[in-house]
């Protein structure tokens, strides 16, 4: 994951994604990380995964697609820490969130403000960046 300021990469984080990361999240329980443009819309200090920032999924288009398919789009997608400690970033293990280490999450929370846009996209060559 890249943290970009004024068009320049200022930080790079190794990440873990949903257990089935390739492809856009469509419904609750699909273990996919949503792809597209969202907003980091609030901070959660009491996360079970250390600390977290909420991603504004589902957006209007996500809700419309889920309705068309007759499914629940899910929600509560976060960028969060790596607690519990038995989870590792070498494998994708989340239920659709983006996980970084706890120390990196502390840094991320200090650097990133509520209201910051986030663009999530899958790339084969950088599947864990």
Regions found by a protein language model. Give the residues of each.
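Electropositive
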Residues: 10-39
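Exported/periplasmic cell-wall-interacting domains
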Residues: 37, 42-129
